[in-house]
Amino acid sequence: MNRKKIIVAVVIVALLAAIGYGWSYYRQQQDATLTLYGNVDIRTVNLGFRVSGRLASLAVDEGDKIQPGEVLGKLDDGPYVNALKQAQANVQSAQAQLALLKAGYREEEIAQVRSEVSQREAAFSYADSFLKRQQGLWANKATSANELENARTARNQAQANLQASKDKLAQYLSGNRPQEIAQAEANLAQSEAELAQAQLNLQDTTLLSPSGGTVLTRAVEPGTILSASNTVFTLSLTDPVWVRAYVSERHLGQAIPGTEVEVFTDGRPDKPYHGKIGFVSPTAEFTPKSVETPDLRTDLVYRLRIIITDADESLRQGMPVTVRFVQP
């Protein structure tokens, strides 16, 4: 009987020990914090003018901190001011031409054409009468063939002149053709587009910062003749500051976008930065050599982009960091 009790007690103790060990192991697994390794990734942008010209001035130097919209440099705007004035004059000319066509002809011009028609009617009447007299004389053999032909030519020319004047009067009375007005409207639209481009070109002689950041490089100096898109400054953006890290396939399930993490640097081992996972690459790759990690280099990993929410000036491009996932 005592032996059975001892066996039962031993079994119970063994079960309790197994349960305790399992619970301890489970807690250790739950409490284990996933640690990743990566580098600070601060985006840079090359800044330049959209138009060409002579560089007149630069307002900042390497290391300067700049704000969005701050003036960084200017080109000599003389040629662009002249181009703008020419474009404005072209628009005014096109507007005047269109207004003239839409207004039609003045009463004075119409009266002048009416008078011209009357004069040419009289000229035609005289030429026609003269031809008829010459034809009568020719029938009586009282004039030469040359005189008759000259009279006929004069009558035909007078008739053509009269018809031209009548056509001109009809045009003046009906106004300009719709096709002419449409062409004038198209010319005005083209002139206005050229004016808008001239205004934009003049505006682009001033280089503005697109965002806040720090000037990394100043590539040229005043007096340089620049082509459009030549780099003038390289700017390190203040925001966003990212960390590029890598996670193995085994831990990929823990790397969910929006997951909060702590980011440690060698200079602040006890004061982490905070961030969230913003992107997980859908494709695997071999661990880059630039990443300090205890994992095997041959392991396939997935790239993460971690957005630092409380970044400061201590974070520099390429700085190695340690990323630890925050336990809920």
Swiss-Prot record:
Lineage: superkingdom: Bacteria
Source species of the chain: Yersinia enterocolitica serotype O:8 / biotype 1B (strain NCTC 13174 / 8081)
Coiled coil: 80-109, 139-208
HAMAP family reported in the protein's UniProt record: UPF0194
tRNA processing listed as a keyword: no
Keyword Signal attached: yes
Name recorded for this polypeptide: UPF0194 membrane protein YE2891
Keywords associated with the record: Coiled coil, Periplasm, Signal
InterPro entries to which the protein is assigned, alphabetical: CusB_D23, UPF0194_membrane_YbhG, UPF0194_transport
Cited SUPFAM superfamilies: HlyD-like secretion proteins
Cellular location(s): Periplasm
Cellular compartments per GO CC: periplasmic space
